[in-house]
Amino acid sequence: MKGYLWGGASVVLVTVAQLVLKWGMMNIPLLSLADINVQFLTMYFVQLASVMCGLMGYALSMLCWFFALRYLPLNRAYPLLSLSYALVYLGAVLLPWFNEPATLLKTLGAGFILLGIWLINIKPIKAS
């Protein structure tokens, strides 16, 4: 059970990190390193902080993942990472600032990912 908690924490952190990174990068103009100055840093502080928080989220997710691997067999742990694909899709569709459309095919794809994770992680039926 401990391994699944660590794995779940890793999935949540990587999902939030991906969404926060996307928001930050959507709101920072494309520019070169020569364009970065104090005015730019103050003008886009929230967006840059969002990107930094996303990167820290990835690092914390990796730390949680190390603990998940310690307690779970790899063939059960690794598919848990796929949860983030479905959760990021859900976040991108539901959160208004991303404005991404939900389509039947994308939703079915996310559903199949969840079904696959469930099939891999269910307890086998013992023959009597």
Swiss-Prot record:
Location relative to the cell: Cell inner membrane
Spans through the membrane: 11-31, 48-68, 78-98, 102-122
Protein's membrane topology: Multi-pass membrane protein
Any one annotated GO CC term: plasma membrane
Cytoplasmic side: 1-10, 69-77, 123-128
Pathway(s) of this molecule: Bacterial outer membrane biogenesis; lipopolysaccharide biosynthesis
One MF annotation (Gene Ontology) recorded for this entry: transmembrane transporter activity
Principal location listed in the UniProt entry: membrane
GO biological process: lipid A biosynthetic process; lipopolysaccharide biosynthetic process; transmembrane transport
Keywords noted in UniProt: Cell inner membrane, Cell membrane, Lipid A biosynthesis, Lipid biosynthesis, Lipid metabolism, Lipopolysaccharide biosynthesis, Membrane, Transmembrane, Transmembrane helix, Transport
Biological role stated in the UniProt entry: Translocates 4-amino-4-deoxy-L-arabinose-phosphoundecaprenol (alpha-L-Ara4N-phosphoundecaprenol) from the cytoplasmic to the periplasmic side of the inner membrane.
Subunit-level organization: Heterodimer of ArnE and ArnF.
UniProt family annotation: Belongs to the ArnF family.
Name of the featured protein: Probable 4-amino-4-deoxy-L-arabinose-phosphoundecaprenol flippase subunit ArnF
Biological source species: Yersinia pestis
Phylogenetic lineage: Bacteria, Pseudomonadati, Pseudomonadota, Gammaproteobacteria, Enterobacterales
